[in-house]
């Protein structure tokens, strides 16, 4: 596959546009630095003066330099001990914004009949709110343990497992396809970090958004300038 720039900042490989959006039935999004502008764990750490320490681990994990993602997340969450729910709400209200084109792309996909899945190594405190605002159909993410309004530095196990890592993102994509009665090739997967690669490999169309180099190299589409809605340039009107 030879990457081709079909427009400034829009690189494709492995297919020839235009595609038909209605040929796809599901679109799966990562959240942090994909649908939204922040890495939530880094911003939460800022509330206890540990952003630099946590962000360094996050950056290494997203580049694929950390082999045990679950352990890296446990380490980061442990450093969040003492953050209050009030501070978490402030981060959501004051720092979190949708990336350019996010709402437009989700709306276009829903209008074309696609279901929308949000799979995140982040936290339900944010994914639940993002899903509600954008009308997202399915979510999977991690639950921070809270006691008396304060983070304990631990996560809560869920019926599906302990932590939503790359393998869990892939599993949730495949489970959602099975639920909808579709093939994974009828799914689009959008992400920016190494933990998005397992689900991107399963999808019929993989999309890297302002992504790490390892992700850009493997994706069918790499959006390197502009917003998420640039993906729509590849589809017939």
Swiss-Prot record:
EC numbers for this chain: 3.1.3.3
Cofactor: Mg(2+)
Ligand binding (substrate): 39, 76, 120-121, 169, 195
Keywords: Amino-acid biosynthesis, Hydrolase, Magnesium, Metal-binding, Serine biosynthesis
Pathway: Amino-acid biosynthesis; L-serine biosynthesis; L-serine from 3-phospho-D-glycerate: step 3/3
Residues the record marks as active site: 30, 32
One Gene Ontology term from the biological process aspect of the record: L-serine biosynthetic process
PANTHER family per record: PHOSPHOSERINE PHOSPHATASE
Record family assignment: Belongs to the HAD-like hydrolase superfamily. SerB family.
Protein name: Phosphoserine phosphatase
Lineage, broadest ranks: Bacteria, Pseudomonadati, Pseudomonadota, Betaproteobacteria, Burkholderiales
């Amino acid at each position: 596959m030879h990457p081709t720039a079909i427009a400034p900042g829009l690189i494709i490989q492995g297919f020839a546009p235009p595609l038909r959006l209605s040929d796809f039935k599901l679109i799966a999004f990562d959240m942090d630095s994909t649908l939204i502008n922040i890495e939530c764990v880094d911003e939460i750490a800022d509330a206890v003066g540990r952003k630099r320490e946590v962000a360094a681990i996050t950056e290494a994990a997203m580049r694929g330099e950390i082999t045990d993602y679950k352990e890296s997340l446990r380490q980061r969450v442990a450093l969040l001990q003492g953050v209050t729910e009030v501070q978490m709400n402030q981060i959501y209200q004051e720092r979190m914004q949708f990336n350019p084109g996010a709402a437009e792309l989700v709306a276009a996909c829903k209008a074309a009949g696609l279901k929308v899945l949000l799979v995140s190594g982040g936290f339900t405190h944010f994914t639940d709110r993002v899903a509600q605002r954008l009308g997202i159909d399915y979510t999977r993410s991690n639950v921070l343990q809270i006691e008396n309004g304060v983070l304990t530095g631990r996560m809560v196990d869920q019926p599906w497992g302990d932590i939503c890592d790359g393998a869990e993102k892939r599993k949730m994509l495949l489970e959602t396809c099975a639920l909808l009665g579709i093939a994974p090739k009828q799914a689009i997967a959008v992400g920016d970090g190494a933990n998005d690669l397992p689900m991107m490999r399963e999808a019929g169309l993989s999309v890297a958004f302002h992504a790490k180099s390892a992700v850009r190299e493997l994706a069918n589409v790499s959006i390197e300038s502009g917003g998420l809605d640039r993906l729509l340039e590849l589809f017939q009107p």
